[in-house]
């Protein structure tokens, strides 16, 4: 009986020790989990700044502005100039008269300069101040009459029915609220006015580009490519099926006609050079 009691007491003490160790271990584990969660949240906030998407996007393009401007200057002196000029002219109505054209997300002013040289009144806007400076300098060097200003593509300061045409190239994929942007673009063009939106899902494919391919992004640093990929992950538009989504949205918004041209990429970028876009480009064309 004494032996049994002793063993029971021994076991109880063992249980108390186990319980105490287990309790301390669980507290320690909880603290470690909490710290790990805080660390992961810090990393996520740093790389996926959901609270201020536009600031992050603007910072990315600001850091790319100088090299981007240099590449656009070269493109304006390359065979791509004629290809893009012919492409734009094939869609522009009343080409014999001067039209009021808004270049959305104009970057270094590539479309603005081309359309201005065709005799149209063109204003380019971009949310990134450094890009607008590049556009102004490039336009001045080419004696272009195109004008530029810093403005948000989702919140235009122009009156309703101001423009005949809105053009955009490689813009919509990195807009936090593309539905608001489309609504604004439709608002500022006159009835019967035209939207020409050239776009592609650039960020989705940054990690999948063959190393041997000669393309427009091959000299972009890995750090900038990662930031570009972050933009893709933090924006809702990246999960949309495009350009079908664009068609459905513009139709719901009251566009009288919406069409898609998926052959623009192969036509403009038929060969791999420093301007080559290795992801499928498409045109969303809408009439108000």
Task: Show which residues each predicted segment covers.
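C-terminal alpha-helical "lid/dimerization" subdomain adjacent to the S-adenosyl-L-methionine
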Residues: 55, 72, 200-270
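Class I SAM-dependent methyltransferase SAM/SAH-binding core
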Residues: 102-104, 108-155
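A short acidic, Gly/Pro-enriched loop at the edge of an enzyme's catalytic core
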Residues: 154-165
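A short SAM/SAH-binding and catalytic strip from SAM-dependent methyltransferases
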Residues: 165-178
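A short glycine-rich, Lys/Arg-flanked "PGG" loop and its adjoining helix->strand segment in the class I
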Residues: 179-191
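Conserved beta-strand signature within the Rossmann-like core of class I S-adenosyl-L-methionine
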Residues: 193-200
């Amino acid at each position: 009986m004494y032996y049994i009691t002793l063993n029971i007491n021994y076991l109880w003490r063992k249980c108390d020790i186990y319980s105490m160790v287990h309790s301390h271990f669980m507290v320690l584990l909880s603290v470690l989990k909490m710290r790990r969660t805080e660390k992961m949240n810090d990393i996520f906030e740093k790389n996926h700044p959901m609270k201020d998407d536009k600031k992050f996007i603007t910072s990315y393009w600001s850091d790319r502005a100088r090299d981007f401007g240099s590449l656009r200057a070269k493109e304006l002196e390359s065979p791509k100039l004629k290809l893009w000029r012919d492409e734009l002219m094939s869609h522009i109505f009343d080409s014999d008269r001067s039209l009021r054209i808004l270049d959305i997300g104009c970057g270094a002013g590539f479309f603005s300069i081309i359309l201005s040289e065709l005799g149209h009144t063109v204003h380019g806007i971009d949310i990134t101040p450094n890009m607008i400076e590049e556009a102004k300098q490039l336009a001045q060097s080419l004696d272009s009459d195109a004008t530029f200003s810093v403005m948000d593509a989702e919140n235009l300061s122009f009156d309703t029915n101001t423009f005949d045409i809105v053009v955009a190239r490689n813009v919509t994929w990195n807009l936090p609220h593309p539905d608001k942007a489309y609504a604004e673009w439709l608002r500022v063009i006159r009835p019967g006015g035209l939207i020409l939106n050239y776009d592609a899902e650039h960020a989705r494919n940054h990690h999948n580009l063959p190393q041997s391919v000669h393309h427009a992004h091959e000299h972009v640093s890995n750090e900038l490519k990662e930031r570009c990929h972050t933009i893709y992950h933090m924006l809702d538009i990246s999960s949309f099926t495009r350009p079908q989504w664009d068609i459905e949205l513009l139709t719901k918004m009251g566009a009288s006609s919406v069409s898609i041209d998926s052959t623009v990429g192969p036509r403009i970028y038929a060969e791999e050079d420093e301007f080559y876009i290795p992801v499928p480009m498409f045109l969303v064309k809408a009439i108000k």
